[in-house]
Amino acid sequence: MRLFLSLPVLVVALLMILEGPGPAQGAPEAVDTSSGLDKLKEFGTTLEDKVREFFNRVKESDIPAKTRNWFSETLQKVKEKLRIES
């Protein structure tokens, strides 16, 4: 049974290999590759700048301090309620 199933799979794989690359799968030109790498490098640089700017903005804002204070206050309230009920 295994041989019966594996033979058609092998034949299809061989046909695909022997057919060769399709028109869309042709070898890329060197110019396209270098321009693609340049675009990728530019994208990486832009992304890096945006991420740095975001983290700097978060560091400079007072959101982390406010969040920390809110959690501390909420924790204190919960502790007080647990003491009263105990």
UniProtKB/Swiss-Prot annotation:
Inhibitor of lipoprotein binding to the low density lipoprotein (LDL) receptor, LDL receptor-related protein, and very low density lipoprotein (VLDL) receptor. Associates with high density lipoproteins (HDL) and the triacylglycerol-rich lipoproteins in the plasma and makes up about 10% of the protein of the VLDL and 2% of that of HDL. Appears to interfere directly with fatty acid uptake and is also the major plasma inhibitor of cholesteryl ester transfer protein (CETP). Binds free fatty acids and reduces their intracellular esterification. Keywords: Lipid transport, Secreted, Signal, Transport, VLDL. Residues 1-26 form the signal peptide. InterPro entries: ApoC-1_sf, ApoC-I. The gene is APOC1. One of its GO terms (cellular component) is very-low-density lipoprotein particle. This is Apolipoprotein C-I. It is found in: Secreted.
